[in-house]
Swiss-Prot record:
Name the UniProt record assigns to this protein: Transgelin-2
Protein's organism: Rattus norvegicus
Domain Calponin-homology (CH): 24-136
GO CC aspect terms: actin cytoskeleton
Superkingdom as given in the UniProt entry: Eukaryota
Amino acid sequence: MANRGPSYGLSREVQQKIEKQYDPDLEQILIQWITTQCRKGVSQPQPGRENFQNWLKDGTVLCELINSLYPEGQAPVKKIQASTMAFKQMEQISQFLQAAERYGINTTDIFQTVDLWEGKNMACVQRTLMNLGGLAVARDDGLFSGDPNWFPKKSKENPRNFSDNQLQEGKNVIGLQMGTNRGASQAGMTGYGMPRQIL
């Protein structure tokens, strides 16, 4: 949290809840994938949330990652340079986010720049990178490097084609939502509180 003081009360509870969502095992998987995918001497950080954040904070690793998912000459981020200036780092992070959105990640799955730069929500950063990896595996264009089992499998379209005869038969079936004339019924039941009549 670079520019913010400590949070108190409800803000502190919310921040602690967000920090509990961070997964150290997932961090190791993501580091392994990023270093495998980038190949260009990307160093591996020490384990830990802060080290992971500092590794990604300047945006160069993220830009190298998104560029490695595109064919040669079609890289979305043209200029990648390490910088110590805050606005340059944030600009590179936002370039990665724009390129990730063009790659196919939903806007709802993308973290905000401050989530990474200030370390406010590193779990959201992990989710974005997981979605990016899963999408790269699903594309199956030969540009993904690493183990496809690191990421959840994306579902693929599976259309069903029914003949006119099958569609017509489906109209004749009475759905269970309409009710059924079999099974238990209320025949012989008495109202609540009435005594049993034994004859």
